[in-house]
Amino acid sequence: MSPLANRRFLKMHGAGNAIVVLDLRGTSIRVAPAEARAIAADAHSRFDQLMVVHDPVTPGTDAFMRIYNTDGSESGACGNGTRCVGYALLDDPAMARPAENGCLTLETKAGLVAVKRVTDRSFTVDMGQPRLRWDEIPLAEPFPDTRRIELQVGPIDDPILHSPAAVSMGNPHAIFFVERDPDTFDLGRIGPLLEAHPIFPERANISIAQVTSRDTIKLRVWERGAGLTLACGTAACATVVAAARLRMIGRAARVALPGGELSIEWRADDHVLMTGPVFLEGEGSLSPDLFAGLDG
């Protein structure tokens, strides 16, 4: 039997991004890709991202998080999921631990993130510094200026999308800025093709963004390893950074996604702050039947 059988989980969402939080502190259990896929496939535990909480690795941190996409792949960052973990570690009776001033320091394979409560159901995450060099994102070939890279969809003389910005927020993003409503583009068809484009050796999150004012952006996201999503916090952060670099906006904006709105600020110290809501939908336990026949 899988050691995950009968483990308790929280079902949450952040601005529409479906999140499952699984607490594995005090154990040596690691989630295998096949187990993550099985959890995602079940109607009771379906997720866009699975946030697995482990004991801290680095002194002074509160927990280590592993982040899984629906296809079982791991990600280095998930802003909406991090807010949900912040809620769980501060408010859930079975998970909460004492924290100073409602603040937590969490670690992922991409680095440290700080979470702070704003209101009962709103949290701010310090997502750290964006990575802007081509080899940090990473891209498969050198681009001296990642504000625009050479990539397009459609005919050479009349492309549907072209010249995206490239940014990493602990995971790679390509952002296409457009003048018309992002909903008018078939991102469900375009997204998977671009996600796996050879220019992105680690694949990429694909966003279509419309700047509607100096401090508002409308955004649609195809999420690497998950597909079309109602919200993606790291994509919102990457989009604000990219738009600011192109002087389309200042250094702060409200980003409207199908699942809700996020407030993003790229501070003068180069850190990106994301503020948004969390919602607890319920809890459950992982059925042993989910893992029957899995070999990991």
From Swiss-Prot:
Homodimer. Its EC number is 5.1.1.7. Keywords: Amino-acid biosynthesis, Cytoplasm, Isomerase, Lysine biosynthesis. Belongs to the diaminopimelate epimerase family. Substrate binds at residues 17, 49, 69, 79-80, 171, 205, 223-224, 233-234. It is found in: Cytoplasm. The record marks 173, 223 as: Could be important to modulate the pK values of the two catalytic cysteine residues. The keyword ATP-binding does not apply. Catalyzes the stereoinversion of LL-2,6-diaminopimelate (L,L-DAP) to meso-diaminopimelate (meso-DAP), a precursor of L-lysine and an essential component of the bacterial peptidoglycan. The active site is at 78 (proton donor), 232 (proton acceptor). This is Diaminopimelate epimerase. One of its GO terms (cellular component) is cytosol. It holds the Pfam family DAP_epimerase. The lineage of its organism: Bacteria, Pseudomonadati, Pseudomonadota, Alphaproteobacteria, Hyphomicrobiales. It comes from the Bacteria. Pathway: Amino-acid biosynthesis; L-lysine biosynthesis via DAP pathway; DL-2,6-diaminopimelate from LL-2,6-diaminopimelate: step 1/1. The keyword Transmembrane helix does not apply. The gene is dapF. It comes from Methylorubrum populi (strain ATCC BAA-705 / NCIMB 13946 / BJ001). It catalyses: (2S,6S)-2,6-diaminopimelate = meso-2,6-diaminopimelate. GO terms for molecular function: diaminopimelate epimerase activity. GO terms for biological process: lysine biosynthetic process via diaminopimelate.
